[in-house]
Protein backbone atom coordinates (compact mmCIF):
# COMPACT_ATOMS: atom_id res chain seq x y z
CA UNK A 1 0.00 0.00 0.00
CA UNK A 2 1.25 3.47 -0.86
CA UNK A 3 2.04 6.16 1.70
CA UNK A 4 -0.38 9.03 2.23
CA UNK A 5 -4.14 9.00 2.68
CA UNK A 6 -5.12 9.66 -0.94
CA UNK A 7 -2.58 7.15 -2.24
CA UNK A 8 -3.93 4.56 0.21
CA UNK A 9 -7.45 5.24 -1.00
CA UNK A 10 -6.30 4.86 -4.61
CA UNK A 11 -4.78 1.46 -3.78
CA UNK A 12 -8.00 0.39 -2.03
CA UNK A 13 -10.11 1.68 -4.93
CA UNK A 14 -8.08 -0.30 -7.45
CA UNK A 15 -8.19 -3.63 -5.67
CA UNK A 16 -11.77 -3.54 -4.36
CA UNK A 17 -12.89 -2.80 -7.91
CA UNK A 18 -10.67 -5.31 -9.68
CA UNK A 19 -11.16 -8.36 -7.45
CA UNK A 20 -14.93 -8.44 -7.94
CA UNK A 21 -15.15 -6.46 -11.18
CA UNK A 22 -16.13 -9.28 -13.53
CA UNK A 23 -18.85 -10.70 -11.30
CA UNK A 24 -19.98 -7.15 -10.57
CA UNK A 25 -20.37 -6.51 -14.30
CA UNK A 26 -22.65 -9.55 -14.60
CA UNK A 27 -24.71 -8.29 -11.64
CA UNK A 28 -24.91 -4.78 -13.10
CA UNK A 29 -25.89 -5.96 -16.58
CA UNK A 30 -28.53 -8.38 -15.30
CA UNK A 31 -29.90 -5.80 -12.87
CA UNK A 32 -30.08 -3.15 -15.60
CA UNK A 33 -31.97 -5.53 -17.88
CA UNK A 34 -34.38 -6.20 -14.99
CA UNK A 35 -35.80 -2.69 -15.29
CA UNK A 36 -37.60 -4.06 -18.35
CA UNK A 37 -38.22 -7.57 -17.10
CA UNK A 38 -41.98 -7.32 -17.73
CA UNK A 39 -41.37 -6.20 -21.32
CA UNK A 40 -38.74 -8.92 -21.82
CA UNK A 41 -41.14 -11.53 -20.42
CA UNK A 42 -43.84 -10.40 -22.82
CA UNK A 43 -41.51 -10.58 -25.85
CA UNK A 44 -40.40 -14.05 -24.79
CA UNK A 45 -44.00 -15.28 -24.75
CA UNK A 46 -45.30 -14.14 -28.14
CA UNK A 47 -48.37 -16.36 -27.80
CA UNK A 48 -49.89 -13.92 -25.28
CA UNK A 49 -52.20 -11.32 -26.82
CA UNK A 50 -52.60 -7.71 -25.75
CA UNK A 51 -55.44 -6.98 -23.35
CA UNK A 52 -58.31 -4.96 -24.81
CA UNK A 53 -60.75 -5.26 -21.92
CA UNK A 54 -61.18 -3.50 -18.60
CA UNK A 55 -59.82 -4.84 -15.33
CA UNK A 56 -63.34 -5.65 -14.14
CA UNK A 57 -64.12 -7.73 -17.23
CA UNK A 58 -60.80 -9.57 -16.97
CA UNK A 59 -61.41 -10.27 -13.27
CA UNK A 60 -64.87 -11.67 -13.97
CA UNK A 61 -63.45 -13.98 -16.64
CA UNK A 62 -60.82 -15.17 -14.17
CA UNK A 63 -63.51 -15.95 -11.58
CA UNK A 64 -65.63 -17.75 -14.20
CA UNK A 65 -62.67 -19.92 -15.20
CA UNK A 66 -61.78 -20.76 -11.60
CA UNK A 67 -65.39 -21.58 -10.71
CA UNK A 68 -65.41 -24.03 -13.60
CA UNK A 69 -61.95 -25.56 -13.12
CA UNK A 70 -60.93 -25.10 -9.48
CA UNK A 71 -64.11 -25.51 -7.46
CA UNK A 72 -62.42 -27.67 -4.81
CA UNK A 73 -59.46 -25.36 -4.26
CA UNK A 74 -58.80 -23.81 -0.85
CA UNK A 75 -57.40 -20.59 -2.35
CA UNK A 76 -57.36 -18.75 -5.67
CA UNK A 77 -54.52 -16.41 -6.58
CA UNK A 78 -55.06 -14.09 -9.56
CA UNK A 79 -52.75 -11.53 -11.18
CA UNK A 80 -54.73 -9.21 -13.45
CA UNK A 81 -53.47 -7.68 -16.73
CA UNK A 82 -51.13 -4.73 -16.27
CA UNK A 83 -50.03 -2.03 -18.73
CA UNK A 84 -46.57 -3.61 -18.94
CA UNK A 85 -47.75 -7.23 -18.84
CA UNK A 86 -51.12 -8.05 -20.43
CA UNK A 87 -51.12 -11.69 -19.33
CA UNK A 88 -53.68 -12.84 -16.77
CA UNK A 89 -52.09 -15.50 -14.60
CA UNK A 90 -53.57 -17.53 -11.80
CA UNK A 91 -52.89 -20.52 -9.63
CA UNK A 92 -54.85 -22.31 -6.94
CA UNK A 93 -54.05 -24.42 -3.90
CA UNK A 94 -55.76 -27.77 -3.48
CA UNK A 95 -56.62 -29.52 -0.21
CA UNK A 96 -53.95 -32.04 0.90
CA UNK A 97 -56.16 -35.02 0.02
CA UNK A 98 -56.37 -33.87 -3.64
CA UNK A 99 -52.65 -33.13 -4.09
CA UNK A 100 -50.66 -35.17 -6.62
CA UNK A 101 -47.69 -36.66 -4.71
CA UNK A 102 -45.86 -37.50 -7.95
CA UNK A 103 -45.32 -33.78 -8.60
CA UNK A 104 -43.73 -33.10 -5.22
CA UNK A 105 -44.40 -29.64 -3.80
CA UNK A 106 -46.14 -28.61 -7.02
CA UNK A 107 -48.64 -31.40 -6.67
CA UNK A 108 -50.82 -29.31 -4.39
CA UNK A 109 -51.21 -26.48 -6.89
CA UNK A 110 -52.77 -25.83 -10.27
CA UNK A 111 -52.12 -22.93 -12.60
CA UNK A 112 -53.35 -21.33 -15.81
CA UNK A 113 -52.73 -18.36 -18.08
CA UNK A 114 -55.83 -16.80 -19.62
CA UNK A 115 -56.50 -14.60 -22.59
CA UNK A 116 -58.27 -11.69 -20.85
CA UNK A 117 -60.14 -10.88 -24.06
CA UNK A 118 -61.86 -14.27 -24.29
CA UNK A 119 -61.37 -15.97 -20.93
CA UNK A 120 -59.84 -19.00 -22.65
CA UNK A 121 -56.74 -20.74 -21.33
CA UNK A 122 -53.57 -20.13 -23.31
CA UNK A 123 -50.64 -22.44 -23.92
CA UNK A 124 -47.60 -20.16 -23.81
CA UNK A 125 -44.02 -21.39 -24.08
CA UNK A 126 -42.26 -22.18 -20.82
CA UNK A 127 -39.76 -19.43 -20.07
CA UNK A 128 -38.48 -17.37 -17.19
CA UNK A 129 -38.42 -14.32 -19.42
CA UNK A 130 -37.08 -11.21 -17.75
CA UNK A 131 -37.32 -12.87 -14.35
CA UNK A 132 -34.18 -14.81 -15.28
CA UNK A 133 -32.15 -11.60 -15.28
CA UNK A 134 -33.87 -10.38 -12.11
CA UNK A 135 -33.00 -13.55 -10.18
CA UNK A 136 -29.55 -13.74 -11.77
CA UNK A 137 -28.51 -10.35 -10.42
CA UNK A 138 -28.78 -11.50 -6.80
CA UNK A 139 -29.27 -15.30 -6.83
CA UNK A 140 -26.73 -16.02 -9.59
CA UNK A 141 -27.13 -19.54 -11.04
CA UNK A 142 -26.03 -23.14 -10.49
CA UNK A 143 -25.03 -22.46 -6.86
CA UNK A 144 -27.14 -22.51 -3.67
CA UNK A 145 -29.19 -19.35 -3.22
CA UNK A 146 -27.80 -18.65 0.26
CA UNK A 147 -24.19 -18.75 -0.96
CA UNK A 148 -25.08 -16.66 -3.99
CA UNK A 149 -26.65 -13.91 -1.92
CA UNK A 150 -23.68 -13.75 0.41
CA UNK A 151 -21.37 -13.55 -2.60
CA UNK A 152 -23.45 -10.79 -4.22
CA UNK A 153 -23.55 -8.90 -0.92
CA UNK A 154 -19.76 -9.21 -0.67
CA UNK A 155 -19.45 -7.73 -4.18
CA UNK A 156 -21.90 -4.92 -3.34
CA UNK A 157 -19.94 -3.96 -0.24
CA UNK A 158 -16.71 -3.90 -2.26
CA UNK A 159 -18.51 -1.77 -4.84
CA UNK A 160 -19.60 0.70 -2.18
CA UNK A 161 -16.03 0.96 -0.90
CA UNK A 162 -14.80 1.48 -4.47
CA UNK A 163 -17.29 4.33 -5.02
CA UNK A 164 -16.33 6.12 -1.80
CA UNK A 165 -12.58 5.69 -2.33
CA UNK A 166 -12.95 6.75 -5.96
CA UNK A 167 -14.49 10.06 -4.91
CA UNK A 168 -11.72 10.58 -2.34
CA UNK A 169 -8.96 9.68 -4.78
CA UNK A 170 -10.02 12.01 -7.58
CA UNK A 171 -9.83 15.43 -5.99
CA UNK A 172 -10.68 16.99 -9.39
CA UNK A 173 -13.42 14.48 -10.10
CA UNK A 174 -16.02 17.00 -11.29
CA UNK A 175 -13.48 18.94 -13.35
CA UNK A 176 -12.31 15.68 -14.91
CA UNK A 177 -15.93 14.91 -15.80
CA UNK A 178 -15.65 17.48 -18.60
CA UNK A 179 -12.30 16.14 -19.79
CA UNK A 180 -11.77 13.40 -22.34
CA UNK A 181 -8.47 13.07 -24.17
CA UNK A 182 -8.88 10.92 -27.25
CA UNK A 183 -6.23 8.41 -28.39
CA UNK A 184 -4.03 9.00 -25.35
CA UNK A 185 -3.78 5.41 -24.16
CA UNK A 186 -3.93 5.15 -20.38
CA UNK A 187 -5.09 8.75 -20.05
CA UNK A 188 -8.06 8.10 -22.37
CA UNK A 189 -9.16 5.05 -20.39
CA UNK A 190 -8.87 6.97 -17.13
CA UNK A 191 -10.90 9.87 -18.55
CA UNK A 192 -13.58 7.45 -19.78
CA UNK A 193 -13.71 5.75 -16.39
CA UNK A 194 -14.05 9.13 -14.64
CA UNK A 195 -16.80 10.34 -16.98
CA UNK A 196 -18.85 7.14 -16.64
CA UNK A 197 -18.43 7.24 -12.85
CA UNK A 198 -19.41 10.88 -12.33
CA UNK A 199 -22.16 10.96 -14.96
CA UNK A 200 -24.43 8.80 -12.78
CA UNK A 201 -22.62 8.97 -9.44
CA UNK A 202 -25.80 9.45 -7.32
CA UNK A 203 -27.34 6.46 -9.09
CA UNK A 204 -24.24 4.29 -8.55
CA UNK A 205 -24.21 5.07 -4.82
CA UNK A 206 -27.98 4.62 -4.47
CA UNK A 207 -28.24 1.33 -6.35
CA UNK A 208 -25.30 -0.20 -4.47
CA UNK A 209 -26.43 0.87 -1.00
CA UNK A 210 -30.08 -0.07 -1.54
CA UNK A 211 -28.99 -3.44 -2.92
CA UNK A 212 -27.28 -4.17 0.39
CA UNK A 213 -30.28 -2.91 2.37
CA UNK A 214 -32.66 -5.33 0.63
CA UNK A 215 -30.87 -8.27 2.29
CA UNK A 216 -29.66 -6.46 5.41
CA UNK A 217 -31.24 -8.94 7.84
CA UNK A 218 -29.40 -11.77 6.13
CA UNK A 219 -26.08 -9.92 6.26
CA UNK A 220 -26.54 -8.54 9.81
CA UNK A 221 -28.73 -11.05 11.67
CA UNK A 222 -27.32 -10.56 15.16
CA UNK A 223 -29.72 -7.84 16.30
CA UNK A 224 -32.70 -10.06 15.52
CA UNK A 225 -31.08 -13.04 17.25
CA UNK A 226 -30.50 -10.98 20.41
CA UNK A 227 -33.95 -9.37 20.51
CA UNK A 228 -35.84 -12.55 19.49
CA UNK A 229 -33.63 -15.41 20.75
CA UNK A 230 -36.34 -18.06 20.71
CA UNK A 231 -38.71 -16.91 17.97
CA UNK A 232 -37.27 -15.11 14.95
CA UNK A 233 -40.53 -15.65 13.07
CA UNK A 234 -42.16 -13.29 15.55
CA UNK A 235 -39.78 -10.54 14.43
CA UNK A 236 -40.74 -10.95 10.78
CA UNK A 237 -44.41 -11.03 11.72
CA UNK A 238 -44.10 -7.80 13.69
CA UNK A 239 -41.80 -6.00 11.26
CA UNK A 240 -43.26 -7.05 7.90
CA UNK A 241 -46.53 -8.69 8.80
CA UNK A 242 -49.59 -7.79 6.79
CA UNK A 243 -53.04 -9.11 7.39
CA UNK A 244 -53.22 -12.45 9.23
CA UNK A 245 -53.61 -15.54 7.09
CA UNK A 246 -57.11 -16.96 6.77
CA UNK A 247 -57.11 -20.31 8.56
CA UNK A 248 -60.84 -20.92 9.13
CA UNK A 249 -62.18 -23.90 7.14
CA UNK A 250 -64.95 -23.42 4.59
CA UNK A 251 -68.48 -23.30 6.04
CA UNK A 252 -71.60 -23.85 3.97
CA UNK A 253 -72.24 -22.45 0.51
CA UNK A 254 -73.28 -18.96 -0.59
CA UNK A 255 -73.35 -16.83 -3.72
CA UNK A 256 -70.62 -14.16 -3.67
CA UNK A 257 -71.06 -10.57 -4.76
CA UNK A 258 -69.98 -9.68 -8.31
CA UNK A 259 -66.21 -9.30 -8.42
CA UNK A 260 -66.53 -5.87 -10.07
CA UNK A 261 -68.44 -4.56 -7.04
CA UNK A 262 -65.69 -5.72 -4.68
CA UNK A 263 -62.97 -4.20 -6.88
CA UNK A 264 -64.86 -0.91 -6.96
CA UNK A 265 -64.98 -0.92 -3.16
CA UNK A 266 -61.20 -1.37 -3.04
CA UNK A 267 -60.64 1.47 -5.53
CA UNK A 268 -62.87 3.76 -3.52
CA UNK A 269 -60.98 2.86 -0.35
CA UNK A 270 -57.69 3.77 -2.12
CA UNK A 271 -59.10 6.94 -3.70
CA UNK A 272 -59.00 5.60 -7.23
CA UNK A 273 -55.77 3.58 -7.27
CA UNK A 274 -56.08 0.56 -9.60
CA UNK A 275 -56.08 -3.10 -8.59
CA UNK A 276 -53.19 -5.49 -9.33
CA UNK A 277 -54.80 -8.78 -8.35
CA UNK A 278 -56.64 -10.66 -5.65
CA UNK A 279 -56.62 -13.78 -3.50
CA UNK A 280 -59.78 -15.67 -2.56
CA UNK A 281 -59.88 -17.92 0.52
CA UNK A 282 -62.61 -20.58 0.82
CA UNK A 283 -64.10 -19.78 -2.62
CA UNK A 284 -67.81 -20.49 -2.88
CA UNK A 285 -68.24 -20.87 0.89
CA UNK A 286 -70.44 -18.76 3.12
CA UNK A 287 -67.31 -17.46 4.87
CA UNK A 288 -65.33 -16.73 1.68
CA UNK A 289 -63.07 -13.66 1.86
CA UNK A 290 -61.11 -11.81 -0.79
CA UNK A 291 -57.80 -9.94 -0.37
CA UNK A 292 -57.38 -7.27 -3.05
CA UNK A 293 -53.88 -5.94 -3.80
CA UNK A 294 -53.02 -2.45 -4.98
CA UNK A 295 -51.16 -1.93 -8.25
CA UNK A 296 -47.56 -0.68 -8.19
CA UNK A 297 -46.76 2.73 -9.60
CA UNK A 298 -48.13 5.19 -7.04
CA UNK A 299 -45.75 4.52 -4.16
CA UNK A 300 -41.99 4.56 -3.69
CA UNK A 301 -42.19 1.70 -1.22
CA UNK A 302 -42.45 -1.96 -2.17
CA UNK A 303 -44.91 -2.50 0.68
CA UNK A 304 -48.12 -3.22 -1.23
CA UNK A 305 -51.38 -2.20 0.50
CA UNK A 306 -54.22 -4.71 0.50
CA UNK A 307 -57.79 -4.82 1.79
CA UNK A 308 -59.91 -7.81 2.84
CA UNK A 309 -63.65 -8.07 2.17
CA UNK A 310 -66.33 -10.59 2.99
CA UNK A 311 -67.27 -11.91 -0.47
CA UNK A 312 -70.89 -12.49 0.45
CA UNK A 313 -71.78 -9.31 2.32
CA UNK A 314 -69.10 -7.01 0.89
CA UNK A 315 -68.12 -5.81 4.37
CA UNK A 316 -64.60 -4.48 4.84
CA UNK A 317 -62.97 -6.86 7.31
CA UNK A 318 -59.47 -5.38 7.61
CA UNK A 319 -56.61 -3.80 5.71
CA UNK A 320 -52.83 -3.90 5.73
CA UNK A 321 -51.63 -2.19 8.92
CA UNK A 322 -49.34 0.83 8.51
CA UNK A 323 -45.62 0.06 8.62
CA UNK A 324 -43.36 1.26 11.39
CA UNK A 325 -40.65 3.80 10.68
CA UNK A 326 -37.82 1.32 10.15
CA UNK A 327 -39.91 -0.99 7.98
CA UNK A 328 -41.23 1.92 5.92
CA UNK A 329 -37.69 3.21 5.39
CA UNK A 330 -36.53 -0.18 4.20
CA UNK A 331 -39.55 -0.43 1.90
CA UNK A 332 -38.70 2.91 0.29
CA UNK A 333 -35.03 1.99 -0.16
CA UNK A 334 -36.05 -1.34 -1.66
CA UNK A 335 -38.50 0.49 -3.90
CA UNK A 336 -35.74 2.81 -5.13
CA UNK A 337 -33.70 -0.25 -6.04
CA UNK A 338 -36.49 -1.92 -8.01
CA UNK A 339 -38.01 1.28 -9.51
CA UNK A 340 -41.47 -0.25 -9.79
CA UNK A 341 -42.90 3.24 -9.26
CA UNK A 342 -41.24 4.62 -12.41
CA UNK A 343 -43.20 5.68 -15.47
CA UNK A 344 -41.73 5.05 -18.93
CA UNK A 345 -39.51 8.16 -18.91
CA UNK A 346 -38.08 7.62 -15.44
CA UNK A 347 -37.62 3.92 -16.15
CA UNK A 348 -35.61 4.77 -19.25
CA UNK A 349 -33.45 7.10 -17.14
CA UNK A 350 -32.84 4.31 -14.61
CA UNK A 351 -31.95 1.97 -17.48
CA UNK A 352 -29.50 4.42 -19.05
CA UNK A 353 -27.92 5.03 -15.65
CA UNK A 354 -27.51 1.28 -15.26
CA UNK A 355 -25.81 1.09 -18.66
CA UNK A 356 -23.44 3.87 -17.59
CA UNK A 357 -22.71 1.83 -14.47
CA UNK A 358 -21.83 -1.15 -16.67
CA UNK A 359 -19.43 1.07 -18.64
CA UNK A 360 -17.88 2.29 -15.39
CA UNK A 361 -17.20 -1.25 -14.15
CA UNK A 362 -15.99 -2.45 -17.56
CA UNK A 363 -13.63 0.50 -18.05
CA UNK A 364 -12.29 0.00 -14.53
CA UNK A 365 -11.13 -3.59 -15.10
CA UNK A 366 -9.74 -2.69 -18.54
CA UNK A 367 -7.93 0.32 -17.08
CA UNK A 368 -5.95 -1.92 -14.73
CA UNK A 369 -4.67 -4.02 -17.65
CA UNK A 370 -3.79 -0.94 -19.71
CA UNK A 371 -1.89 0.50 -16.76
CA UNK A 372 0.02 -2.72 -16.07
CA UNK A 373 1.02 -3.55 -19.64
CA UNK A 374 3.94 -1.05 -19.93
CA UNK A 375 5.45 -2.48 -16.74
CA UNK A 376 5.45 -5.96 -18.27
CA UNK A 377 6.76 -4.64 -21.59
CA UNK A 378 9.98 -3.57 -19.90
CA UNK A 379 10.72 -7.15 -18.86
CA UNK A 380 9.89 -8.49 -22.32
CA UNK A 381 7.25 -10.96 -21.08
CA UNK A 382 3.64 -10.83 -19.95
CA UNK A 383 3.05 -12.28 -16.51
CA UNK A 384 0.31 -14.70 -15.53
CA UNK A 385 -1.70 -12.03 -13.68
CA UNK A 386 -1.95 -9.75 -16.71
CA UNK A 387 -2.82 -12.64 -19.03
CA UNK A 388 -5.55 -13.72 -16.61
CA UNK A 389 -7.01 -10.21 -16.39
CA UNK A 390 -6.84 -9.79 -20.19
CA UNK A 391 -8.73 -13.05 -20.73
CA UNK A 392 -11.36 -12.23 -18.10
CA UNK A 393 -11.78 -8.75 -19.56
CA UNK A 394 -12.38 -10.05 -23.08
CA UNK A 395 -14.57 -12.96 -22.01
CA UNK A 396 -16.70 -10.81 -19.69
CA UNK A 397 -16.80 -7.30 -21.17
CA UNK A 398 -17.15 -8.53 -24.77
CA UNK A 399 -18.48 -12.01 -23.99
CA UNK A 400 -21.45 -11.18 -21.76
CA UNK A 401 -23.33 -9.34 -24.56
CA UNK A 402 -23.03 -12.53 -26.64
CA UNK A 403 -24.60 -14.48 -23.77
CA UNK A 404 -27.48 -12.01 -23.41
CA UNK A 405 -28.27 -12.22 -27.12
CA UNK A 406 -27.94 -16.02 -27.06
CA UNK A 407 -30.59 -16.17 -24.33
CA UNK A 408 -33.07 -14.47 -26.67
CA UNK A 409 -32.05 -16.76 -29.53
CA UNK A 410 -32.66 -19.76 -27.30
CA UNK A 411 -36.16 -18.56 -26.53
CA UNK A 412 -37.04 -18.56 -30.22
CA UNK A 413 -35.12 -21.64 -31.41
CA UNK A 414 -35.46 -24.23 -28.64
CA UNK A 415 -38.30 -26.73 -29.23
CA UNK A 416 -41.48 -25.67 -27.47
CA UNK A 417 -42.16 -29.09 -25.98
CA UNK A 418 -38.81 -29.98 -24.41
CA UNK A 419 -38.74 -30.71 -20.70
CA UNK A 420 -37.46 -27.97 -18.39
CA UNK A 421 -37.44 -25.53 -21.27
CA UNK A 422 -36.85 -22.46 -19.08
CA UNK A 423 -33.75 -24.12 -17.61
CA UNK A 424 -32.54 -24.92 -21.12
CA UNK A 425 -32.79 -21.22 -22.02
CA UNK A 426 -30.66 -20.35 -19.00
CA UNK A 427 -28.16 -23.01 -20.04
CA UNK A 428 -27.86 -21.39 -23.47
CA UNK A 429 -26.88 -18.14 -21.75
CA UNK A 430 -24.08 -19.79 -19.80
CA UNK A 431 -22.90 -21.98 -22.69
CA UNK A 432 -22.46 -18.84 -24.79
CA UNK A 433 -20.65 -17.01 -22.02
CA UNK A 434 -18.49 -20.04 -21.29
CA UNK A 435 -17.53 -20.26 -24.97
CA UNK A 436 -16.54 -16.60 -25.02
CA UNK A 437 -14.42 -17.03 -21.89
CA UNK A 438 -12.75 -20.15 -23.29
CA UNK A 439 -11.86 -18.39 -26.54
CA UNK A 440 -10.46 -15.44 -24.58
CA UNK A 441 -8.27 -17.70 -22.43
CA UNK A 442 -6.96 -19.52 -25.50
CA UNK A 443 -6.02 -16.32 -27.33
CA UNK A 444 -6.25 -13.18 -25.14
CA UNK A 445 -5.15 -10.79 -27.90
CA UNK A 446 -6.49 -7.47 -29.13
CA UNK A 447 -8.19 -9.00 -32.19
CA UNK A 448 -10.17 -11.31 -29.91
CA UNK A 449 -11.81 -8.14 -28.56
CA UNK A 450 -12.89 -7.18 -32.07
CA UNK A 451 -14.10 -10.67 -32.99
CA UNK A 452 -16.23 -11.06 -29.88
CA UNK A 453 -17.66 -7.56 -30.20
CA UNK A 454 -18.56 -8.25 -33.84
CA UNK A 455 -20.14 -11.57 -32.85
CA UNK A 456 -22.18 -9.84 -30.15
CA UNK A 457 -23.23 -7.18 -32.65
CA UNK A 458 -24.41 -9.78 -35.15
CA UNK A 459 -26.20 -11.79 -32.45
CA UNK A 460 -28.17 -8.76 -31.24
CA UNK A 461 -28.91 -7.36 -34.70
CA UNK A 462 -30.25 -10.71 -35.91
CA UNK A 463 -32.64 -11.21 -32.98
CA UNK A 464 -35.46 -9.38 -34.85
CA UNK A 465 -34.74 -11.54 -37.92
CA UNK A 466 -34.97 -14.77 -35.91
CA UNK A 467 -38.13 -13.41 -34.30
CA UNK A 468 -39.68 -12.71 -37.71
CA UNK A 469 -38.84 -16.21 -38.94
CA UNK A 470 -40.28 -18.01 -35.91
CA UNK A 471 -43.28 -15.96 -34.70
CA UNK A 472 -46.04 -13.70 -35.94
CA UNK A 473 -45.05 -10.86 -33.57
CA UNK A 474 -42.41 -9.28 -35.80
CA UNK A 475 -41.69 -5.63 -36.60
CA UNK A 476 -43.86 -5.62 -39.71
CA UNK A 477 -46.91 -6.37 -37.55
CA UNK A 478 -46.04 -4.72 -34.24
CA UNK A 479 -45.20 -1.37 -35.84
CA UNK A 480 -48.41 -1.43 -37.87
CA UNK A 481 -50.48 -2.29 -34.78
CA UNK A 482 -48.73 0.27 -32.58
CA UNK A 483 -47.52 -2.41 -30.15
CA UNK A 484 -44.55 -0.42 -28.88
CA UNK A 485 -43.52 -2.93 -26.23
CA UNK A 486 -42.75 -5.66 -28.77
CA UNK A 487 -41.59 -3.26 -31.48
CA UNK A 488 -39.41 -1.39 -29.01
CA UNK A 489 -37.71 -4.62 -27.96
CA UNK A 490 -36.77 -5.51 -31.55
CA UNK A 491 -35.58 -1.98 -32.27
CA UNK A 492 -33.50 -2.02 -29.08
CA UNK A 493 -31.80 -5.22 -30.25
CA UNK A 494 -30.81 -3.49 -33.49
CA UNK A 495 -29.52 -0.47 -31.54
CA UNK A 496 -27.40 -2.65 -29.25
CA UNK A 497 -26.05 -4.49 -32.27
CA UNK A 498 -25.04 -1.20 -33.90
CA UNK A 499 -23.27 -0.01 -30.74
CA UNK A 500 -21.33 -3.26 -30.39
CA UNK A 501 -20.39 -3.15 -34.08
CA UNK A 502 -19.03 0.36 -33.60
CA UNK A 503 -17.00 -0.80 -30.60
CA UNK A 504 -15.64 -3.74 -32.60
CA UNK A 505 -14.68 -1.48 -35.51
CA UNK A 506 -12.90 0.91 -33.16
CA UNK A 507 -11.06 -1.95 -31.49
CA UNK A 508 -10.02 -3.41 -34.84
CA UNK A 509 -8.56 -0.08 -36.00
CA UNK A 510 -7.06 0.87 -32.65
CA UNK A 511 -3.27 1.03 -32.40
CA UNK A 512 -1.88 1.03 -28.86
CA UNK A 513 0.03 4.27 -28.26
CA UNK A 514 3.76 4.03 -27.67
CA UNK A 515 4.96 4.15 -24.10
CA UNK A 516 7.27 6.96 -23.03
CA UNK A 517 10.21 4.54 -22.99
CA UNK A 518 9.43 3.32 -26.51
CA UNK A 519 9.10 6.88 -27.79
CA UNK A 520 12.44 7.77 -26.24
CA UNK A 521 14.06 4.69 -27.76
CA UNK A 522 12.78 5.50 -31.24
CA UNK A 523 13.77 9.14 -30.96
CA UNK A 524 17.27 8.12 -29.95
CA UNK A 525 17.50 5.73 -32.89
CA UNK A 526 16.43 8.47 -35.30
CA UNK A 527 18.97 10.92 -33.91
CA UNK A 528 21.89 8.46 -33.87
CA UNK A 529 24.77 8.97 -36.44
CA UNK A 530 24.25 6.98 -39.58
CA UNK A 531 26.48 3.98 -40.31
CA UNK A 532 29.32 4.52 -42.85
CA UNK A 533 27.61 2.49 -45.58
CA UNK A 534 24.34 4.34 -45.02
CA UNK A 535 26.19 7.67 -45.04
CA UNK A 536 27.95 6.83 -48.33
CA UNK A 537 24.69 5.78 -49.95
CA UNK A 538 23.05 8.97 -48.75
CA UNK A 539 25.94 11.08 -50.13
CA UNK A 540 25.81 9.28 -53.49
CA UNK A 541 22.09 9.79 -53.73
CA UNK A 542 22.51 13.46 -52.88
CA UNK A 543 25.24 13.87 -55.56
CA UNK A 544 23.17 12.19 -58.24
CA UNK A 545 20.29 14.48 -57.38
Which residue stretches match the model-derived regions?
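Conserved histidines in hydrophobic membrane contexts and catalytic metal-binding motifs
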Residues: 1-545
Amino acid sequence: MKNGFRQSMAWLHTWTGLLVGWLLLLIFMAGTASYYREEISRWMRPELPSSNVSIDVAAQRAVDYLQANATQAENWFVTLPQPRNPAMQMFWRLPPELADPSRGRRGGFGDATLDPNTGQALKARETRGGDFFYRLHFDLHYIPVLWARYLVGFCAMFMLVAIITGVITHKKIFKDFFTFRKDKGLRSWLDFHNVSAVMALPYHAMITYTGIVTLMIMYLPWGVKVAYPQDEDKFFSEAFGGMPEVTAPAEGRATPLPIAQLLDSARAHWHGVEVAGFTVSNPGAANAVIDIRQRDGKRLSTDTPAVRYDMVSGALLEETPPSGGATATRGVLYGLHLARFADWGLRALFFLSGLVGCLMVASGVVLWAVKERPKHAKSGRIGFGLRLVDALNIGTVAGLPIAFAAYFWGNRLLPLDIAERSSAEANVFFYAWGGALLAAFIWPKRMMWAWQLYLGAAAFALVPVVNALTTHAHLGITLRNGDWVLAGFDLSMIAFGAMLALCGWRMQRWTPPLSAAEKKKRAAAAAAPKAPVEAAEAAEAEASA
